[in-house]
Amino acid sequence: MKNRWLLPEGISDLLPDAAQDLEGLRRALLDTYRRHGFELVLPPLVEYLDSLLIGSGGDLDLKTFKLVDQLSGQSLGVRADITPQVSRIDAHLLQQRDINRLCYAASVLRTRPSGQEGSREPIQIGAEVYGHAGIEADIEVIDLLLQSLALAELGPVRLDINHLGLASLLLAELEGVDEEVVLQLLQARDLPSLRELLAPWSQQPAAAALLALPECFGPAESAMARARTVLAPWPQATPHLDALDAVLGSLRLARHAGQVSLAIDLADVQGFRYHTGLGFAAYVEGHARAVGRGGRYDGIGAAFGRGRPATGFSLDLRELVELRRDRHTPPAIIVAPWSDDPALLAFIDTLRAQGETVLQLLPGQDAQRLAGVSADRTIGFIHGQWRLAGKES
């Protein structure tokens, strides 16, 4: 007999503990974004395919589930990333504004997981700034990313920063090189294969510089010094390096000292076809993949009639909850007996209004068999009144 309870690979349920943890974190993050002036938007799950794939290169196309609209016959896609949708909202629906700060939290669906054990249905949360080309907008979203990870309580964070314009200007000098393969080998830090691929251009300084990019990795000060040495022959690299220095020297990010270490990684070219400037990735101890990514994607709304500067970040709430699962403690609740006594119901309402969780047992339900909760107090009828028992109230 077919196991009807099985789910597709990379798709999973969230059971009560994890779902409660995720929802609590989602609310805390969105409240934080709101207090920073970011407005919540909720794009639809499905859109016309050409809208979903705007400015994304081929990566997002491969990740997108496609279907045919039974009403119009047009090709639709289930969103694999929310940023193109938010850029459409900024460009078309909120075009009367100057600078937009927008945030979101919703599920996406992907044909393939992002990692070996990753989910194909991440619950993506993020924040984006549209309409400001200065480094200040990048610093604002990086600061908000670090605050988000602090709220998630994942421990110390390493933030790797890059500027995709550096690899771009080197690749532009190597006529005929297979850029996609170069980018893959850079990301994998496969120097032997990269050296072999670049052998026909071995006499060109740009090839040597590309091979040196993986060495421009590590603690910010030493990695930046190495980067300036490697890229010294290219004056056009100076503004990009200065932008990296501006982020590293930001007083706003300095307040995270002790919990965040800043690093440079010029070989991290993930999102090369998507990002147009600064890129960044956040890592936590014991987890190989980045837990948060972001960067600049200027002009993403051009296809919607309004190409603007844009920068932002995203996180996967499922992944954050999985990483903090060992920190989860069952919610403390108050157990009340089943009764229609108005005095008991009024007492329960008062406790709930104060933020307490009160579970009223159904007839015949055994309080000793409550799963997934910590019943640290009970309500009993004591000396003619309904009172809390089991803990000093």
Where are these regions (language model features)?
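Extended alpha-helical scaffolds
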Residues: 152-159, 164-168, 177-179
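A structural signal for short, well-ordered beta-strand segments and their strand-loop junctions
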Residues: 40-43, 104, 158-162, 263-264
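Acidic, His- and aromatic-enriched active-site or binding-groove loops in soluble protein domains
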Residues: 63-70, 176-198, 203-206
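Cap/lid and interdomain-hinge subdomains that line or gate substrate/regulatory clefts
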Residues: 133, 137-138, 160, 167, ...
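Short, basic, helix/turn surface patches
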Residues: 66-78, 187, 382-393
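TRNA-binding/sensing appendages of the translation machinery
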Residues: 1-84, 139, 160
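Positively charged, Gly/Ser-enriched RNA/tRNA-binding surfaces
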Residues: 18-36, 48, 83-96, 102-154, ...
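Beta-rich nucleic-acid/ligand-interaction surfaces
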Residues: 45-61, 162-172, 268-277, 368-372
